[in-house]
Amino acid sequence: MKEKKLVPKLRFPGFTEPWEQRKFGEIFEYLRNNTLSRDSLNYKNPNVKNIHYGDILVKFDEILDGSNKDIPYINSEVDLSKFSKSLLRDGDIIFSDTAEDDTVGKAIELQNVNALFILSGLHTIPCRPLIPFGKGYLGNFLNSDSYRLQLRPLVQGIKVSSISKSALKDTMIEYPKNLDEQEKIGSLFYYIAKMITLHQEESFLHKYML
């Protein structure tokens, strides 16, 4: 039986190749996270930064810049020697593996972190692509409705929901082969997200100025 080609209906001009579709476990490797609580973090004493699952759920957008001031530091007395090989890089992805609502599984893509020291913290699943991806593409795809529909039946728990590494590995990742097309898609969704945020801020100000 001939394999059906994955060709989106809407494309940027100049791109015609079918998209790839591969299992998560084929194109990502898992990294090590730590289990530091909020008590081990601060915002005053510069040190190694730490991405906490709660911040992924509440504070961070799909694309996270390493210079973001909402990323806390790890207290200087904490021994981080065993995490020396777990420092994050540009393009790495971090999932929140637990939540009290349907935001479980939210993912962020890291950018501008290569010159920094950043680790993945409590209740997170950090992973690194094994193949190149265009800037911004994965952060948007992994939070898209089509991907999150795959996650929904894999979530466990009632009051507190969670998702596991083993569940993620069989989900399907869809992407254009061309990195330029990937980056155009990433840029488009970044622009849309910024416009939505700006509109929400304007609506908030308008409400309280009346």
PLM-predicted stretches and their roles:
Residues 8, 26, 183-195, 199:
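Extracellular/lumenal glycan-associated surfaces
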Residues 17, 156, 177-179, 192:
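Loop/turn elements at beta-strand to alpha-helix junctions within RNA-recognition modules
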Residues 22, 63, 198-208:
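Short, tandemly repeated low-complexity microdomains enriched for cysteine and small residues
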Residues 11-40, 179:
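Non-catalytic DNA-recognition/assembly elements of restriction-modification systems
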Residues 1-17, 201-210:
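Short amphipathic coiled-coil heptad-repeat segments
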Residues 28-175:
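DNA target-recognition domains and sequence-specific DNA-contacting regions of bacterial/archaeal
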